[in-house]
């Protein structure tokens, strides 16, 4: 059987406060592992993964950035050319949720693609002490025209779905990416039926 052609390479960013689990989400998605002692990212981490969504094989270049202020000088080059962004907060930390507006402002300032697809992820739903409700996350996502999902890098709940939904929406956005492939497949159905935790709120 012939190897399926990769139709495009997409640049995906993961942003949010330090400690919300950005690196853990990336590690779970790319390597299906979880390290409870995951150290804070210094600067930028970068991983590549191939993903097939709706019959389209894409290569994802996923950038994970440090949430700390002292690394913010990396910002302009980090955002340049990105087609998708995953904005992460910790459902057990109201403070991380309250900082989302600042991250969105930075995204608007530095992103070079105005139609970039945004996904809001409420991480660490395995924890008992939730400070942010699902409704609060959904309301914020709707207000800012973002996809939304709650997830847990620890249990792997919602992680695959988050990346698949993001990539599917990018593929369905004309002009956001380029392809030389003739194998593009477009579908017009939404994310219904892919599990209770996934919401498309655009």
Swiss-Prot record:
It comes from the Eukaryota. A motif (Effector region) lies at residues 38-46. GO terms for molecular function: GTP binding; GTPase activity. Keywords: Cell membrane, GTP-binding, Hydrolase, Lipoprotein, Membrane, Nucleotide-binding, Prenylation, Protein transport, Transport. It is found in: Cell membrane. The keyword Zinc-finger does not apply. Pfam families: Ras. Signal peptide: none annotated. A lipid is attached at residues 198, 200 (S-geranylgeranyl cysteine). GO terms for cellular component: plasma membrane. It catalyses: GTP + H2O = GDP + phosphate + H(+). Its EC number is 3.6.5.2. It is a lipid-anchor. InterPro entries: P-loop_NTPase (IPR027417), Rab (IPR050227), Sigma_54_int_dom_ATP-bd_1 (IPR025662), Small_GTP-bd (IPR005225), Small_GTPase (IPR001806). GO terms for biological process: protein transport. GTP binds at residues 18, 21-24, 35-36, 41, 67, 124, 126, 153. The small GTPases Rab are key regulators of intracellular membrane trafficking, from the formation of transport vesicles to their fusion with membranes. Rabs cycle between an inactive GDP-bound form and an active GTP-bound form that is able to recruit to membranes different sets of downstream effectors directly responsible for vesicle formation, movement, tethering and fusion. This is Ras-related protein Rab-18. The lineage of its organism: Eukaryota, Metazoa, Spiralia, Lophotrochozoa, Mollusca. The gene is RAB18A.
């Amino acid at each position: 059987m012939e190897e399926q052609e990769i139709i495009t390479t997409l640049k995906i960013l993961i942003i949010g406060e330090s400690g919300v689990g950005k690196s853990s989400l990336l590690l779970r998605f790319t390597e299906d592992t979880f390290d409870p002692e995951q150290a804070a990212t210094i600067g930028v981490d970068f991983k590549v993964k191939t993903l097939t969504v709706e019959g389209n094989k894409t290569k994802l270049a996923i950038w994970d950035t440090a949430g700390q202020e002292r690394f913010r000088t990396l910002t302009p080059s980090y955002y340049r050319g990105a087609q998708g962004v995953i904005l992460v907060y910790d459902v057990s930390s109201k403070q991380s949720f309250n900082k989302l507006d600042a991250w969105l402002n930075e995204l608007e300032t530095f992103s070079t693609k105005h139609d970039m697809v945004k996904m809001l992820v409420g991480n660490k739903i395995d924890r008992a002490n939730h400070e942010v409700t699902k409704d609060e996350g959904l309301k914020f996502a709707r207000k800012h025209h973002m996809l939304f999902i709650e997830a847990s890098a620890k249990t792997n709940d919602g992680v695959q779905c988050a990346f698949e939904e993001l990539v599917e929406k990018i593929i369905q956005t004309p002009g956001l990416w380029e392809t030389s492939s003739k194998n593009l497949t477009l579908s017009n159905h939404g994310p219904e039926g892919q599990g209770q935790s996934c919401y498309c709120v655009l």
